């Protein structure tokens, strides 16, 4: 009778009732009353263990043993159904938190001369393949996409500032990825991170954030170049200005209220406002030619160093590598701690560096481990399956390409401004009590946006930091590797005068 009842409960998936009756049978059998039934129950229980997540012999240790399995390198093969659902949910949450990058990154790449359609395809491929590599090699729930800030460095510093073509800039991306991969195979990645003072690392983040704000205001038509005052605010009678500011307000409100997919919703809302108030140029209103892959053929694998100055290329690769290391190492470490997977640090760093190499081939700015992965980790992501789920959704976004190409600048610009604002809290970690540390940090923060060059802003901050510490007799506090980096930046400025 017990066996037939259990089979009925099993078939009806009444797990709680099944477990209760199963334990009764097991206890009686274990005490010697029904040895034959015990054997039947034991066989049934062993076959059912994957479904209800209990162990006949170690039920009281289920939670702790399962946690150990979830953090082991091969845990993906031992996931129970509830784990699979949680990983899928986490990957979906991460995707909707980061999907805005498809629109924003392609818009920034377009300013470098890369066709927007091709930029969309490159962004999707780099994100999808990056997430797959992270899931399969890194086995961690992190998300890899082209980084905000470093994409601005690609377009506005390397291409527009240093005079590289986008083909040469892509070559610099691939070479910086190779450097990052070589560094990730050794202990140099940690030495490089610790050699740079924390105040300067935080200042770089703040400076890039301010540069994003400046780019966003200009892209949204709120400000424009002016000979008399350098920057001039545009008329608020312009519908484009009003749409940009309204979308910025919408973005902030959605974020403050913690609405899921807030940035994506803000882009959709901003696009609707732009078309409603006819703030969209005719070119954007008609799209850029559908979802044809023909334009991508002119981008994929087109990286080239032909015609590039060796010194300019070296500085570009060196600066990119520094920023890539800074953006990734600290964030990877924090997110792995959050997910309880700190033992995966080396593999995750290697996976990230591999995707940077592929970024140059696909035709986009460097990929990074993005902060949006925290949303997926909070939703329960613990293994690489969450990343694989995110990558799969990125591939499926190809379906939406005809719609993505219709998104106007007025819907993208507020996202740049908002993300720049999110980078401001880093200023709290900068100490201005010791001016030999505070002033170089200030120089980086001010000069990156005002000189419109991430490389030059970092260079001035690094050189002044070394100089000030020597001047006040605290040169021993600075690591030798930092002096070497500072000298390389000095050479950068010297070569510019020749």
UniProtKB/Swiss-Prot annotation:
Keyword terms of this UniProt record: Cell membrane, Membrane, Transmembrane, Transmembrane helix, Transport
Bilayer disposition of the protein: Multi-pass membrane protein
Function: Transports adenine, guanine, hypoxanthine, xanthine, cytosine and uracil. Transport is probably proton-dependent.
InterPro entries, alphabetized: Azg-like, NCS2
Pfam families for this protein: Xan_ur_permease
Localisation: Cell membrane
Family, similarity comment: Belongs to the nucleobase:cation symporter-2 (NCS2) (TC 2.A.40) family. Azg-like subfamily.
Membrane-traversing stretches: 88-108, 118-138, 142-162, 169-189, 203-223, 236-256, 259-279, 312-332, 357-377, 388-408, 412-432, 443-463, 478-498
Lineage: Bacteria, Bacillati, Bacillota, Bacilli, Bacillales
Organism: Paenibacillus larvae subsp. larvae (strain NRRL B-3650 / LMG 16245)
Activity control mechanisms: Inhibited by the proton gradient disruptor carbonyl cyanide m-chlorophenylhydrazone (CCCP), but not by the sodium gradient disruptor ouabain.
Top-rank taxon: Bacteria
GO MF annotations in UniProt: purine nucleobase transmembrane transporter activity
Name of protein: Nucleobase transporter PlAzg2
GO cellular component, one term: plasma membrane
């Amino acid at each position: 009778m017990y066996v037939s009842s259990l089979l009925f409960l099993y078939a009806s998936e009444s797990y709680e009732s099944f477990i209760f009756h199963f334990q009764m049978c097991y206890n009686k059998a274990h005490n010697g009353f029904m040895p034959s039934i015990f054997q039947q129950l034991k066989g049934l229980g062993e076959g059912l263990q994957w479904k209800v997540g209990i162990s006949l012999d170690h039920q009281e240790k289920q939670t702790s043993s399962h946690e150990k399995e979830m953090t082991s390198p091969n845990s993906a093969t031992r996931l129970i159904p509830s784990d699979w659902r949680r990983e899928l949910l986490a990957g979906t949450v991460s995707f909707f938190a980061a999907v805005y990058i498809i629109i924003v990154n392609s818009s920034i790449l377009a300013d470098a001369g890369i066709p927007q359609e091709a930029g969309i395809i490159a962004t999707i491929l780099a994100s999808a393949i990056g997430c797959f590599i992270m899931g399969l090699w890194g086995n961690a729930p992190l998300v890899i996409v082209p980084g905000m800030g470093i994409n601005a460095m690609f377009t506005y510093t390397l291409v527009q500032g240093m005079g590289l073509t986008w083909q040469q800039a892509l070559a610099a991306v691939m070479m910086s990825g190779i450097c990052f991969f070589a560094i990730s195979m050794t202990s140099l990645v940690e030495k490089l991170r610790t050699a740079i003072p924390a105040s300067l690392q935080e200042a770089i983040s703040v400076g890039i954030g301010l540069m994003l704000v400046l780019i966003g205001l200009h892209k949204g038509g709120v400000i424009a170049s002016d000979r008399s005052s350098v920057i001039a605010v545009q008329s608020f009678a312009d519908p484009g200005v009003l749409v940009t500011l309204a979308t910025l307000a919408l973005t902030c409100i959605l974020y403050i209220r913690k609405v899921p997919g807030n940035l994506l919703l803000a882009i959709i809302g901003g696009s609707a406002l732009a078309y409603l108030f006819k703030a969209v140029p005719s070119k954007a209103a008609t799209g850029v030619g559908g979802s044809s892959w023909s334009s991508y053929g002119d981008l994929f694998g087109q990286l080239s160093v032909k015609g590039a100055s060796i010194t300019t290329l070296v500085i570009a690769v060196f600066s990119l590598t520094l920023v890539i290391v800074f953006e990734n190492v600290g964030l990877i470490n924090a997110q792995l701690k959050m997910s309880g997977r700190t033992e995966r640090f080396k593999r995750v760093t290697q996976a990230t560096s591999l995707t940077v190499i592929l970024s140059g081939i696909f035709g986009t700015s460097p990929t990074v481990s993005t902060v949006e992965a925290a949303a997926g980790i909070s939703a329960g992501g613990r293994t690489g399956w969450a990343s694989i789920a995110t990558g799969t959704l990125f591939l499926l976004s190809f379906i939406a390409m005809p719609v993505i190409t219709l998104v106007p600048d007025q819907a993208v610009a507020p996202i740049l401004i908002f993300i720049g604002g999110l980078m401001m809290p880093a200023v709290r970690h900068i100490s201005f009590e010791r001016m030999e540390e505070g002033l170089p940090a200030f120089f980086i923060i001010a000069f990156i946006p005002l000189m419109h060059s991430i490389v030059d802003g970092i260079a001035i901050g690094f050189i002044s930091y070394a100089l000030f510490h020597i001047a006040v007799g605290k040169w021993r506090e600075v690591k030798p590797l930092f002096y070497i980096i500072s000298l390389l930046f000095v050479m950068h400025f010297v070569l510019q005068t020749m």
